[in-house]
Amino acid sequence: IRPAALCAAANRSFALYRSRKEAHVHAEAMRTALTEQYSAMADALSVLSEQLGRPGNPEPYKSGRVAAFFASLGTPPLECAVTLDDLGRTRAAVTLPRTRFSSPELAALAQETGRICRRDFDPPQVLSCKGMTTLLFCEKPALRAVFGTAGTAAKGTVSGDAVQQFCSPAAAQMILCDGMGTGRPAAVDGSLAAELTARLLKAGFTAELAARLVNVALALKSDEESGATLDLISVDLYTGTARIFKAGAAPGFLVHGGRARPVGDISLPIGILGGVNGQSRVVHLAAGDYAVLVSDGLLVDGPGWVAKQLELSAAAGDPPEKVARILVETARARAEQ
């Protein structure tokens, strides 16, 4: 027996076995991720097709009057449709030969089209494609969203937090993602999760479906484990209904009637498991309320002081940008004590 040769052969055999085992595990993970991705896409397409299948109840009289108005301006529409959706909201879509409009012109068109339809319209969304311009008029929502954000990284580090805030035609969306770990890899994961979630929401995906697709994207991003928390709130600006979705995120806060309360349960981040273990909740917001998303770094001393500060800010009527700045500055001061 030659011990050295035997050990070398055993090492080679074990290395080959381990390599094959890792390849098998990686292939299995890829199959699971792709299956989850296709399943999420199928569910998303089902939801989108259902939405497209409910275009609303047509209102031919108003459609004719709106078409006549545009014709009187010297731009007879190629198509004109005024519809009433299931929630009683009036929408108008006018397709014209490709035309450029200034902001004052769009505001004037919205005012006159709204007068014809007996509704208060926002300036229309303008879509241009293949020599045509489509103007999409929607009713002004009952609520208006005002955003604010503030953040800071620990000394000598890069923050893994990423924020997206925007309004879609019917809802205000706010996203906060915190990449797992520290440094630039965490920042990359957080930014990827926030940006991809925002793009999916703008395309009409629900929070749950967006989370499933982002989960797959993080899982397939690299051979190393990638993960991020997902904190999302979507507020219907017509009804005030707010849908909160959290996956691994720190508790948020709602300020209603001047009283602050934490919201959110314990869950796992996205990107570390084959599925998404998120928590959903529906609440109602009114004018003057605050919805606050925070990362775990703000809660090192617990949520009590945050709730008290939010109630003070609500009593003073502070704008969201000021509220966010006060919370971050106070958290930093408390951490340095």
Describe the predicted segments one by one.
Residues 179-203, 266-274, 285, 289-335:
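Active-site-proximal, acidic helix/loop segment immediately C-terminal to a metal-coordinating Asp/Glu
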Residues 93-94, 172-176, 244, 291-294:
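Short hydrophobic-aromatic micro-motifs
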Residues 87-91, 142-144, 169-173, 286-290, ...:
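Short hydrophobic/glycine-rich mini-motifs in sensory/regulatory modules
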Residues 1-117:
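Soluble C-terminal extramembrane regulatory/interaction domains of multi-pass membrane proteins
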Residues 226, 232, 243-246, 251, ...:
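Generic detector of multi-pass transmembrane helix bundles and their immediately adjacent loops
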Residues 128-180, 185, 191-195, 278-281:
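N-terminal entry segment of metal-dependent catalytic domains or homologous docking segments
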Residues 139-161, 211, 215-221, 250-282, ...:
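PP2C/PPM family metal-dependent serine/threonine protein phosphatase catalytic domain
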Residues 57-88, 108-110, 114-131, 187-257, ...:
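Catalytic core of PPM/PP2C metal-dependent serine/threonine phosphatase domains
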